[in-house]
Every structure is written in C-alpha cells, then in structure tokens.
C-alpha cells in the first residue's frame, strides 16, 4: 500500500454529491456569464450562446510561458525540471477576472463549483494528463483562518471530483508571506522562495496535478512544484486563468 492509498485525511472541501443534487433541484445552475438557467444537458457551466467562440488557452510552456499550439512541444525547446506541463482554462481578463475576484475577495464560494468542474471537463476533453492525485496551492494557516477558506482548494476539490481523482493535502505553507499583487516578477520569486514544505514521500513517478486559481509569473506554482518533485512526484499544473502581463 502506498502513502497515497493510506492517506486518510482528505483535503476536499466540496460538499457531498447528494447535497449538490438537492441544491441543483431548488437552485438550478445558471450560466456563469449571463445568468441564464442551464439545461441538464449542458456540460460547461455556461450557456450555448456564451460558449460560442470560447476556446481554452490550453497548454503553456512552463519554461518560456508562451502558448503551445497543438500537442507539439514549445519552440523554445527548453524544459522546467519541476513542472512537466501547464494548462490554463482562460486569460485573466474581463469576466474571468471578475469571477475570480469575487470568489477570492468577496467570498463567493459558490463560484468554485462551476469553475472547478469546468477545469476538470476541459482536462478530460483535451486529455491533458492522467494524474494519480490532485494537490492545491495551500495558504498559510493564519491567512486561511482570516479569509475563511482557500479558493484554490475549493476549485481543486471540484476538479478532482469531476475527473474522479483524490484531492490530498500534500503541501503546507510554512511562512506567511506578503501579498504578491504589487510585487515585480523578481520580487515575487524572492517572496515565495522556500515557503512550502511537505512531509509526504510519494512513490517515485507519482503523477500530481497541482491546481491554483491564477498563474502570473509562475513563482508560486513553480516553488510548490519543486517541493513536490523532491518528494518523488512528476508535477503538472492547471489553473483557471493565465495572466501573462507580468514579465
């Protein structure tokens, strides 16, 4: 039995399926963008009208952070040893920025379900990777108590449920850092250095999908991936939104 098989304390914050079902009966799911009631046949949490023309950002090169077209490798032919691949659902603009801002700062936890499920559906459709386990970027315990929840953990819980994998707490954030929001690219990497830890040793080659809400410079995800890699994992990243403006 591996450590993953024997891990009893799941991090998943998603409510039980029966509660989701009852909630959907009395409060039908609505389009994330226009709020139209969705039919039960809808896959993505947006209506057909809003989904016209939408295409996920897709694969991003972890080394040069350019978009990878098709399934070929990036033209830069570089590699980032800790992060094997990276998938983004959208760009951090417009309505996507509004949704994530409301989830994170205005505590609209209900947004985590459709966002996490949508990410999971796209991962399945595009056969992004076949992870053994889902892990989310952790908050420091003081920051999570202050906010009341971890938005990345909530999103990851629903993504894990959608793709049928477990969401496990394999990472801890041991230092309560200042916000990355106003920092430059260089400052972000310095701010997040050596702030994550893990006391779990994984079977060599365990495929881990590391989930966060936003990828900007990649400083947070790459630092977390470094820790998971040192524990024996092969790490793939997946995010709701990609913000390529900070270089």
Question: Residue locations for each model-derived region?
Answer:
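Glycine-rich phosphate/pyrophosphate-handling loop used in enzymes and phosphotransfer proteins
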Residues: 1-247
